[in-house]
Amino acid sequence: MTDRGSDGATVESEDLDTNRDNSVDASPQRVLITGGAGFIGSHLSELLLDRGHHVTVVDNFSTGLRSNPARVRAVATRHPRYEVIEGGVSEVLPTLSPERFDRVYHLAAAVGVRLVVEKPIHTIETNIEETSVVLRFAAARALPILIASTSEVYGKGVRVPMREDDDVVYGATSYSRWCYACSKAIDEYLALAYHRESGLPAVIVRFFNTVGPRQIGEYGMVLPRFVRAAMAGEDLEVHGDGRQSRCFCDVRDVVRALPMLIGNPACAGGVFNLGRDEIISIKDLAELVVATLGSRSRIRMVPYEKAFAAGFDDLAVRQPDLTRIRGAIGFAPSIPLVQTIRDLAAELTEREGEVADMVAAGGAR
């Protein structure tokens, strides 16, 4: 199948089975994952270890749970090739040699609507500075690298569904809400510049709403917030009129796509949407959570002005066009949203105490 790359060039690709690692080299890889103790990173670590790869994680635990690496170790005890280095990317990577690794996944970032709105300096500096450090690290040995980006890069959304080559429009710089989108767009520009100028095999993934076990709601993530409220019999707070619509994809489906993208030379220099394309409104999502968990919770509408700063801007619809990633790797998510809700509820029950301790401590160390 033929698709257009990020620079307009055609890319020849073939449909691939999403249940296996379609890497060019099936031998064990030495993998570095920044942000590997976080939500997506811990699931990716677990997947790669299960496939026999060596995994080194760099994470400062600012938003990741300390139990995540322990969970990975428990599952991957038969694969004693797992190392966790605590610290920021800018601190740790200068102490490591690129010669130690075969691939790099850069997942570390400032994430979550509330964190972005409340800490814009942290958001901008973390996203841009750390991505620059990681790209220089990978470029020193021309390591294949996957850069985690976001659907937020589409800004106000010129059209729906959103395609990787769409133009983007952001709000005024006086609203910090857009600093996350702009910082991740800069990350993309930088990664693509490394690819064009030095041949760095970099691939960019724009994650849409990714959900599932190990996700926390303290920084604005909607599904774990709804699930926790429903389990406690509390009101589910829906911001605005609730008609804003999103597409939710299970993290276990998402991480299966990442090794295939980084392992396919035809994907280098490309930008790929990653998620589901089935739309659900936030109000309908709240109702689905209540029904799935058999909760007696009510749904309460909350104006954006009460949830965030005045002038907060949100998109009516965020839906990915998945044509490119389907053509490149045959991506087809299989876990239904109802199953994700049930699994998240079960996992939230297990770790409720740790989340409370992290929030009380302010999240970051």
PLM features: what roles do these ranges have?
Residues 113-116, 212-213, 307-311:
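A short acidic, helix-capping loop that chelates divalent metal ions and anchors anionic groups
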Residues 4-8, 20-24, 44, 50, ...:
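C-terminal substrate-binding subdomain of Rossmann-fold SDR/epimerase-dehydratase oxidoreductases
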Residues 186, 190, 194, 226, ...:
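Hydrophobic alpha-helix immediately C-terminal to the catalytic Tyr-X-X-X-Lys motif of short-chain
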Residues 60, 67-70, 97, 157-160, ...:
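Short aromatic-enriched loop/helix-cap "lid" or pocket-rim segments at secondary-structure transitions
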Residues 85, 158, 175, 215-219, ...:
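Residue-level signature of the cytosolic catalytic core of signaling kinases
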Residues 2-210, 344-348:
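N-terminal Rossmann-like NAD(P)+-binding domain of SDR-like oxidoreductases, especially those catalyzing
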Residues 66-70, 188, 224, 283, ...:
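Short, surface-exposed alpha-helical segments at coil->helix boundaries
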Residues 127, 183, 219-220, 318:
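Short, conserved glycine- and acidic-residue-centered signature motifs
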